[in-house]
Amino acid sequence: MSKEKIIGIDLGTTNSCVAVMEGGDPVVIQNSEGARTTPSIVAFTAKGETIVGQFAKNQAITNAVNTIRSAKRFIGRRFNEAGDESKMVSYKVIRAGNDGVKFETVSGEFTPQEIAARVLQKMKKTAEDFLGHEVKKAVVTVPAYFNDEQRQATKDAGRIAGLEVERIINEPTAAALAYGFDKKKTNAKIAVYDLGGGTFDVSILELGDGVFEVKSTNGDTHLGGDDFDNVVMQWMIDEFKKQTGIDISGDKNTVQRLKEAAEKAKIELSGTSSTQINLPFITADASGPKHLDMTLTKAKFDEITRSLVERTRIPCINALKDAGLSASEIDEVILVGGSIRIPAVQALVKEIFGKEPNKSVNPDEVVAVGAAIQGGVLAGDVTDVLLLDVTPLSLGIETLGGVMTKLIERNTTIPTRKSQVFSTAADNQTTVSVHVLQGEREMASANRTLGRFDLVGIPSAPRGVPQIEVTFDIDANGIVHVSAKDLGTGKEQKIRIESSSGLSEEEIKKMVKDAEAHAEEDKKLREAADTKNELEAIVYQLEKTIGESADKLDESEKQRAQDEIKRGREAMESGDLERMKASRDSIQQVAMQIGQKIYSQAGPEQGAPGAEAGAGASQGASGTDANGEKVVDADYTVVDEDKK
């Protein structure tokens, strides 16, 4: 019996595509309508029918409120993140119970995952008709800058569609895999510029001897062809209002007509200098019906969309920087996604990388082809290819002083596993709270919360004694798992970051931009937090030493120590960096003198004070558990384990 096939699916914002390995080569499969790509559109009718693909697109104008397109732009996102996006679609976007997103239709309410599942089912059926047997497994692609929640939501969509998603891979990585599949002996550095219907990614890879290694990735999860269409549509609305005084943006069916006309105009302007937009009977007033008839030139199109094209520049520059390469060191630039046909986009790519982009791949199919190749690797049909991808954003936890302690840096090769050992920050602490974060900023509050959980039942002990190992594990799909384990008792708590919401493109872009713009500010905040942590630790230790060794010290020594402790606490309350540094240094001198005196009296068999693990290290953030007990994350020492 032959091996089970693992198909490759490009689940796109505008169109989707499916491919499979046949006879050692990837084959793009035609759907039942005879097309190699399928519109990612799902429609619901009053009769209870569900229509997917081209037929759904055909009836969109007459059934706009029940036709869901571009659902990928909502997947894994919170309702409050979708405000601007929801205003630009013809269907109704509502809040789900978990603060996620749902679409309201005549057939009921549906999540973005459910809509994506309908498209995946169409892809599954297309493959089954071609292969002549049932398909159960697939590799599904996502934008490289999709966060954990969006990846998990995509995997959930596959499960809803009846597919085991064997691997989630990044779209530009899949494109590179397809480009280099027949060039495995070639050693090259390539950039993949992927501007699709709803997302933009750029990845830098090294190819050689069948190894496809991603060096860096960057992007914008809310930038694509839809945005170009929306700009053109808004221009049409504004122009019509100037001509007639009528605002036609309020009617859903009219908006759908405008959207389709804008997309058509955009496509035509990739090959002509102007296009005529004609929509008869677009609206009516007391004087009778009104028709929309206007000309859009390529020059005007370039003018109104220039800011969108420019938004792709900084991610390209940052990707090169993270990869440690200059533009001149890139051998090939591969263009992916339907929106790369826009001449201004191609011109910008040439300007950034200093060379003509490579147009040898089909931008609509190459991602599905790469997914099929990866499916062949997983099925054992392809044996001479190794894919090494990366995680796009840093991951860590909050530690004392509101600091983000990164366990996994962005652009780390996945799968990976890293651990750090923490301890308690208070005597008799029985619970440790773990606040999981994603982002590039130094301070926790400037990053995004992915989840929180508590490890309870820690035996009462002095601060610094319990050993709590926190482990981050990112699998090959880029999905995050976090655990905390008390090494003393073996008690463990785990969390998988759930897919109730996702990052908007603005948030991700802002994370990296803010990290660069506020680098100096973050450095000062981090230094203040670390200094306060050090001061708190040494105050605690000196106070403990005095209490335990009072009989070995005279009154003047004890009084001097108490005065230093008081000044240290006052410095911590002030938050002034220089004052805390001075107090820390002064207390260290006093503590050293007292320690030497106690040690000289005690003899060599006893250890010097301040020897317990973790003293003076960064510590965790405070809170309370369900019983009102103090919960504080604490000290750490680094224990890295890389599973590449």
UniProtKB/Swiss-Prot annotation:
Highest taxon, organism lineage: Bacteria
Family: Belongs to the heat shock protein 70 family.
Induction annotation: By stress conditions e.g. heat shock.
Name assigned to this protein: Chaperone protein DnaK
One annotated GO molecular function: unfolded protein binding
Species the sequence originates in: Leptospira biflexa serovar Patoc (strain Patoc 1 / ATCC 23582 / Paris)
Alphabetical list of PANTHER family matching this protein: HEAT SHOCK PROTEIN 70KDA (PTHR19375)
Encoding gene (name): dnaK
Modified residues (Phosphothreonine): T199
Annotated InterPro entries: ATPase_NBD, Chaperone_DnaK, Heat_shock_70_CS, HSP70_C_sf, HSP70_peptide-bd_sf, Hsp_70_fam
Biased composition (Basic and acidic residues): 550-584
Gene3D superfamilies according to UniProt: 1.20.1270.10, 3.30.420.40, Actin, Chain A, domain 4, Substrate Binding Domain Of DNAk, Chain A, domain 1
Ranges where the record places region Disordered: 550-586, 599-644
CDD domains: ASKHA_NBD_HSP70_DnaK-like (cd10234)
